[in-house]
UniProtKB/Swiss-Prot annotation:
Record field: compositional bias (Basic and acidic residues): 20-30, 160-169
Bias (Basic residues) ranges: 10-19, 31-40
Alphabetically ordered keywords of this record: GTPase activation, Ribosome biogenesis
Gene source species: Shigella sonnei (strain Ss046)
Protein name in the entry: Der GTPase-activating protein YihI
Subunit structure, interactors included: Interacts with Der.
Amino acid sequence: MKPSSSNSRSKGHAKARRKTREELDQEARDRKRQKKRRGHAPGSRAAGGNTTSGSKGQNAPKDPRIGSKTPIPLGVAEKVTKQHKPKSEKPMLSPQAELELLETDERLDALLERLEAGETLSAEEQSWVDAKLDRIDELMQKLGLSYDDDEEEEEDEKQEDMMRLLRGN
């Protein structure tokens, strides 16, 4: 028996069937319809985009339309003035304690040594030294002290010692 010719054609190279005009038009309409539907689905912003099926409650997706919960003033309101915290005032030192602090100030000592050595200070340093020396003078006047008291007392003691020596002999 001879094999049928129809079977041999189907197994071999099949000739591509040409599409009719109606089929081509239908495919073109389908392609156009698909092309129109590209992009985001309508209402995707309101729907939230991600639709994960999960248990409602804690894991519920948040609505992207809901923003910050801070209240926004709608009318003109008075300006709110913030009260500044008062700076912690330095504890009031007694004049004696303040004088001791100024006399033991390392920066003041260093600048005075530079002045004695003949160096010139910057305007800022000079004004700082002048202010500190003025404060020392004020404190010494309050306490009834002076620079010359120590020297005069030493001279007075020397004179008294001399007088005692002269009288004693």
